[in-house]
Amino acid sequence: MTILEVGSQLIESAVLQMSLTSVLLTASVFTLTLGYFSKLLFTQHSSEHTKYPPHIPSSLPFLGQAVAFGRSPIEFLEKAYEQYGPVVSFTMVGKTFTYLLGSDAAALMFNSKNEDLNAEDVYARLTTPVFGKGVAYDVPNPLFLEQKKMLKTGLNIAQFKQHVEIIEEETKDYFRRWGESGERNLFDALSELIILTASRCLHGCEIRSLLDERVAQLYADLDGGFTHAAWLLPGWLPLPSFRRRDRAHLEIKKIFYNVIKKRREDTEKHDDILQTLIDATYKDGRPLSDDEIAGMLIGLLLAGQHTSSTTSAWMGFFLARDRALQERCYSEQKSVCGEELPPLHYDQLKDLSLLDRCLKETLRLRPPIMTMMRMAKTPQKVGEYTIPPGHQVCVSPTVNHRLQDTWAERLDFDPDRYLHDNPAAGEKFAYIPFGAGRHRCIGENFAYVQIKTIWSTLLRMFDFELVDGHFPPVNYTTMIHTPHNPIIRYTRRNTQPQQ
């Protein structure tokens, strides 16, 4: 083993054991050693006619608020809102972040154009090694929008009607292994199930049939590219997780290339997203290359996997904590679908209104992404303030979803709140788990179908409860805010649904 390999493994081991605060600190030191200390010499001077957002002071040069923010980001932002108002700036690791807190301030981001508030400058270094070149944030925004439109074409109601049957079948097959009762890691189980269901629904039967333990590990290695280290540290570092990510990317693309090649040679047309992409063309008439199709398939799967697995797990723990609510959801299955609980149909999902409200409330209290970011390319006016170019402009769904100004009993899990006055109806950006405006997630409708089908099936199969009253805290060390120590207790229901 070379000195370089030993060194990279030591760095990797350290990063894996770090909190967000520690990673930020390490990134700070690393950045300084690379010569970015010169940023300290840059001072932004306000003209007498320009008012910049209030800036939270720090006694730590360069690091700024990295320690305080990394320790407890939501509480940090809520305190900043109370002290400074809806627009506030602070420095971390030599970069200035400006948060737009609340519905009115958030409108700036969601109504913005990409040439003013740019997404590629923020996300490309994180997504390109995972999805590949030529797709998503690696291409000019107009091209990315064309790619999103192609994917959205394949996410339609006709497809969703087929997906319900597929997802129910996959869920039953997966959870048969759980036996009659026990305690299991709910998040891990749902993460695996989401990959299986999404692969079959979105990639097609050929790719789903290849999803064995080896391919599942490749997906896990690719998914390991979404870390604080990948966001903050240069991608060329020889960290073991970076090398695993890069190897997995190449291996998965090889698998996709073979499937795409066979599809192109097949005279029979299939009805799935893979076929949609094979048949699609850009506005200039150019068809998608195999590499672009493979990259878009990877992006579609992994982007949705995070949202659905995290949200599904949190929803399970909220229902396990409130047993009466869980029983109401189970009773709703019988009242909507039939006392004998026959197989689900797409048209029934919209009538499961209580389950829908439970999902909506889960997304309010535990939106999978804490912060949405853009890079300011031009001066941006918000209220009385001007955000200068170079600031990373951020909106936090988590904060918007629990502001006292908007939400009564803001920390309570109360699905029935949507039966009464719904703040999200009066404030356009008070509820934004999937973004909003031109930045809204294209997979939102599929996520609702997927999660509601999974939980309809699980409620029919099991009764859930917390283990000794333990409700998981939020794990802030990950890019997606997952439940920490997500063990749940379950007992299989005596009533067996019809097959």
Swiss-Prot record:
Membrane association type: Single-pass membrane protein
Pfam name, any one: p450
Expressed in which tissues: Strongly expressed in intestine. Moderately expressed in liver, with higher levels in females compared to males. Also detected at low levels in brain, eye, kidney and testis.
Gene3D superfamilies: Cytochrome P450 (1.10.630.10)
Transmembrane segment boundaries: 13-35
Family: Belongs to the cytochrome P450 family.
Role description: Sterol 14alpha-demethylase that plays a critical role in the cholesterol biosynthesis pathway, being cholesterol the major sterol component in deuterostome membranes as well as a precursor for steroid hormone synthesis.
Name this protein carries in UniProt: Lanosterol 14-alpha demethylase
Organism: Danio rerio (Zebrafish)
